[in-house]
Amino acid sequence: MATETIILKELSIGYHTKNGTRVVAEGINAAIQSGELTCLLGANGVGKSTLLRTLSAFQPALSGEIVIRREGVRSQEISAYTDKELSRLIGVVLTEKPDIRNMTVRELVALGRSPYTGFWGTLHEADWQVVDEAINAVRISKLRERMVHTLSDGERQKVMIAKALAQQTPVIFLDEPTAFLDFPSKVEMMQLLRRLAKEEQKTIFLSTHDFELALQVADKLWLMTDELHIGTPHELAQSGALAGYVERPGITFDAQTLTVRVNNDKL
């Protein structure tokens, strides 16, 4: 059963520049549920990455609260947690390419276990079992002993997702996890993330430009335009929010089938 895990209260996000403060979105009141795959949609530059970085505590909110609710534990605002505590609660996969050399895929995935190791970072047999399970889940067993710097962009993305799985956090945030994958791999990745949300009751929230794929696999959508639209794919289709986002001359959206149609004669 889905329960509220991340709760946003009057949240305003943005960043400071030498010319002042740039507000990206403000007054957000919403919740991200456990046991659900939530996809964040929106045009480039609308603030998706800023929202993800704020939710991940990589940058501070301009105002408002981000509350983490955990079963049997008092709810706390995200700023009340230490970095060590957050590393056991939230796993993050960003689009930045890690500059890593002289490390194998298995060694990189093993870094996901660092929140659970002692001062010396020693991994025990149980930790390595978790690492190998994460590698198998993402279907990169053949890459296990490859050096990270020899990987393609798509292979590297899968490795970083395996690292997040090895971290065993109840919450995982991902910034465009399917960006460098071919279409079959995109589908497999989204299905994997959906399965993890369902079977392990994880809270999985990701940004994506794979519009039609998101409509097919997401439990909930967050659509960032001039305002934030939240609902199931069918709810946002019926409200007209999805059509308003994607339609333009030569492009129409079918709210019944959740598909985009292209009229080449009108392009």
Spans of features found by a protein language model:
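Conserved ABC ATPase "signature" region
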Residues: 110, 125-143
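ABC ATPase nucleotide-binding domains
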Residues: 246-267
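The feature captures the beta-strand-to-loop junction immediately N-terminal to the Walker
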Residues: 41-43
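Helix-to-loop junction immediately C-terminal to a conserved catalytic motif
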Residues: 56
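Conserved ABC ATPase signature
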Residues: 147-151
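Catalytic Walker B motif of ABC-type/P-loop ATPase nucleotide-binding domains
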Residues: 172-175
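ABC ATPase NBD Q-loop/coupling interface
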Residues: 65-85
